[in-house]
Amino acid sequence: MFAPGHITGFFVICKSSNKLKTGSIGAGITIDRGVNVELKEGNGSIFYNNKKVNICAVEKVIEHYKKFGYNDDYDIIFSSDFPLGSGLGMSGGCALILAKKLNEMLNLNENYAEIAHISEVECGTGLGDVIAQYVKGFVIRKTPGFPINVEKIVVDDDYYIIIEIFGKKETKEIITNDIWIKKINEYGERCLNELLKNPTLENFVNLSYEFAVNTGLINEKILSICEDLKFTVGASQSMLGNTLFCISKKETLEDALSILKNPIVCNIYY
């Protein structure tokens, strides 16, 4: 079972006393690399790329399904192209596919995406990834949480998404800080309004760059590389992580790859 990675270009933090309606609005793209899950007989351990880990959102999902008879007779094994904390939605992806898996395993008819979203919100590890990963594609989230209200934009399949990961960033430290929230929401709303007027991939990546720079969230090294990649469709930083993403057409792909040290090439995942 697979969940795609999710690149968030920009977002607005939306808080509510109702966890289902807490989340974010904004825009992002899902990619064809992400995370897979399998369950094996065991003692309830969680593994991510062969390393025993604690993933808060995953633990919340497990807690929920224990009410319906799930027990710790299984180890949960996630495998991914990306590390946790890189701004590519891996925490949300793990929660989403595990909720789907347990829903099927226990023959339940629950809205597993809602369970995963609430788990992420409670842990402070994400606000909108689960919704985008559930819907898939180039997704503009118009209202936070559930019920889902998005605009899916169809784009040509001749775009490549190039990623380079430069390290981790703690989502919770930013989305719970009032100074960051004010900056993020001011520029996020502007970018969302502009994208809705002209919902193209080119406009998305340019607005993502503006958001990253204006909020001050962009890493200096990534900023410098974005300047070098201006011959492509555009480049920015995936929110919230120290990960560069670049959108390129085929004719500029090789030149773009030559600038990066450890590039990962993806396609948009629908």
UniProtKB/Swiss-Prot annotation:
Work out whether the entry's keyword set contains Transferase. Answer: yes
Q: Which cysteines are joined by disulfide bonds?
A: none
The biological pathway it contributes to is: Cofactor biosynthesis; coenzyme A biosynthesis
For this protein, the record's Pfam families field holds: GHMP_kinases_N
What InterPro entries would the database entry show?
Answer: GHMP_kinase_N_dom, PoK, Ribosomal_Su5_D2-typ_SF, Ribsml_uS5_D2-typ_fold_subgr
Catalytic activity line of the entry: (R)-pantoate + ATP = (R)-4-phosphopantoate + ADP + H(+)
Q: Looking at the record's lineage, which domain of life comes first? A: Archaea
Q: List, in alphabetical order, the GO biological process terms annotated in this UniProt record.
A: coenzyme A biosynthetic process
Q: What are the record keywords, sorted? A: ATP-binding, Coenzyme A biosynthesis, Kinase, Nucleotide-binding, Transferase
User: Which GO-annotated molecular functions does the record name?
Assistant: ATP binding; kinase activity
* Leader sequence segment: none
The EC number(s) given in the record are 2.7.1.169
Function comment:
Phosphorylates (R)-pantoate to form (R)-4-phosphopantoate in the CoA biosynthesis pathway.
Q: Its family?
A: Belongs to the GHMP kinase family. PoK subfamily.
Q: What is this protein called?
A: Pantoate kinase
Starting at the broadest rank, the lineage of the source organism is:
Archaea, Methanobacteriati, Methanobacteriota, Methanomada group, Methanococci
